[in-house]
A protein has these predicted regions:
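Active-site HxH/HxHxD metal-binding segment of metal-dependent hydrolases
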Residues: 80-83, 90-166, 263, 271
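Divalent metal-coordination and catalytic microenvironments
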Residues: 51, 65, 75, 85, ...
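Metallo-beta-lactamase
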Residues: 24-34, 41-43, 47-49, 71, 78-80, 98, 156, 166-168, ...
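Bacterial N-terminal signal peptides
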Residues: 8-18
Length: 291
């Protein structure tokens, strides 16, 4: 009895005297593709809805959806994030083998980077559009805009989806919405969840930016402007109570803010409108320089 009392007292002392746990350091950079440190800053799972969690980093979205039959992950961030994502699965009380599906938005290293490692370690199946499947299989090489500058480990897609196709897992239906532009194979996803028991429609819309892209007379992507226009309209029409995007700041999210992360989150319409304004300004500048 005396030993138990001493043990409890010692435990209480250690708890009170322990220093505040500091934030973990950022994940290491890749020599070939360096990014902002916040893109690599780990974070613990952040609740978005009752069964949907952000488990990526402060500036890269990776959404974990917990279903009645395993887990679904929408995007994964950078290649070096695989172990971090698996650690966050464990924080949620799951094992790697519980991951069933990897849903892709687009085939860039900062979103599909860890898919190969995750597929290998969990057995999860990769789902993407046909255009993205080609890019995923070659690890981002010969990209329309970036060439071989942002490579990632190649991964074979297990299921190719069409626009409007539904992917069902454990009672949750994920609908694919084609939104080409940022890449020809870009996809957004919508599904239903609850928040505090009330129904909520979630939309994960793909990036609508055109970073350094040639928009006029692009020989490798001649329909790029038309595709962006169509995608702006697609995003506006999504069933959308809560919007999330691969880069959270573009849709008003601040994952570092914890419980207040979505305080300034945009609607789907506001996101599409803001993206189209930026696109129009970029297009006008390109036209001006071409004169």
């Amino acid at each position: 009895m005396r030993l138990q009392t001493i043990t409890r007292a010692l435990a209480a002392f250690l708890l009170l005297s322990s220093p505040t746990v500091a934030a973990p350091p950022p994940l290491p950079q890749l020599q070939a593709y360096t990014v902002d440190a916040a893109w690599l800053q780990p974070m613990e799972p952040l609740r978005i809805a009752d069964h949907t969690w952000q488990i990526g980093t402060q500036e890269l979205t990776a959404l974990l959806v917990e279903t009645q039959d395993g887990l679904v992950l929408l995007d994964g961030g950078m290649p070096q994030m695989a172990d971090h994502l698996l650690a966050n699965l464990k924080r949620r009380g799951f094992a790697p083998r519980d991951l069933r599906l990897l849903l892709s938005s687009h085939a860039h290293a900062d979103h599909a980077g860890p898919f190969a490692a995750l597929k290998r370690s969990t057995g999860a199946r990769v789902v993407a559009s046909a255009a993205s499947a080609v890019m995923l299989a070659r690890g981002g090489s010969d990209d329309l805009h970036f060439g071989d500058d942002i490579l990632f480990p190649p991964v074979v897609v297990d299921r190719v989806v069409m626009d409007g196709e539904v992917v069902a897992q454990g009672g949750v239906e994920f609908t694919a919405h084609f939104m080409p532009g940022h890449t020809p194979g870009s996809i957004g996803w919508t599904w239903n969840d609850t928040r505090d028991g009330k129904p909520v429609r979630l939309a994960y819309a793909d990036s609508l930016t055109a970073p350094g892209y040639q928009l006029l007379a692009n020989p490798r992507y001649p329909r790029i402007v038309e595709d962006y226009r169509r995608s702006f309209a697609t995003v506006r029409a999504l069933p959308c109570d809560v919007l999330l995007t691969p880069h959270p700041d573009f849709s008003g999210w601040d994952y570092a803010a914890g419980a207040a992360a979505g305080a300034k989150a945009m609607s789907c319409k506001a996101y599409a409108d803001a993206s189209e304004r930026r696109f129009n300004a970029q297009l006008a500048e390109e036209r001006r320089k071409a004169r």
